[in-house]
Amino acid sequence: ESQAIKNPASKVTKAASLLNAKNRLCMSGTPLQNNTFDIFAQMNFLNPGLLGNMEFFRNEFATPIDKFGEQEQKEHLRKLLFPFILRRTKEQVAKDLPDKTETILFCEMEKEQRKVYEAYRNSYREKILGTIDQQGIGKSQLTILQGLMKLRQICDSPAILNEDEKYPNHSIKLDELAREIEENIGDHKALIFSQFLGMLALIKKKLIEDGIPFEYFDGSTSAPDREKAIQNFQNNDECRVFLISLKAGGVGLNLTAADYVYIVDPWWNPAVEQQA
């Protein structure tokens, strides 16, 4: 599973490259997820030196492709990789599989939630503009990301903010999700992904209140408990919902019993959502 070696600088990648083997094979659902360096790390494990060293690859491929979208270099890289990739698509292996239907459910915040959102937005707007004036846009990125993260959390529920002042749970998303589950989880099963553990905790609480059996795991769940949860969801007709943290459950999972997937909060990288 080559998800583990996509970062060429990581210890895992370096350790894997030291393994002595006659044959090497990488398996991945998304070989290219973050940037072109994902490909470099995997190919460097399979055929060390084929794409040159890191500096050569950066100058020759990564910068021209990722930064400037140069078609010629994309095509050159594609031709280099082509003989080493065995690719199967859904069309080839599962013709009977229905198309994925995506629906974006827009939720309008109610008064209390909107009030908290506006207060944080105004506060961070002043803070960000002040930081940009003092340090320039380049050095203000952390403050901007901080502000965006807070607003994203409030969109889920102000209750999940990690602040000294605790806010009550006003969440239009949770209300909508509960309505969706009630309507759709009759003869169906659903996966629910969120990047925020606080939001997953609120959903857990709601499912318990509504008497809906579910399974759960996040990054802290041990491998045996994770496997137990997977088997129960797959094989137990009573268990209709699986709550999963987006980063922990986005890869290396086959949950074929589910036919609904809810992504509660969008991730920065669309490829992570696609994987989920």
Predicted segments, located by residue:
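Conserved SF2 helicase motif VI
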Residues: 270-276
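A short beta-strand-to-loop transition that corresponds to the Sensor-1 phosphate-sensing loop
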Residues: 1, 27-31, 89, 194-196, ...
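A short beta-strand element within the Helicase C-terminal
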Residues: 38-41, 253-266
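RecA-like P-loop NTPase motor core
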Residues: 39, 79-126
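Conserved P-loop NTPase motor "coupling/switch" region that bridges the ATPase
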Residues: 4, 10-93, 133
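Residue-level signature of catalytic and energy-coupling elements of molecular machines
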Residues: 2, 28, 81, 110, ...
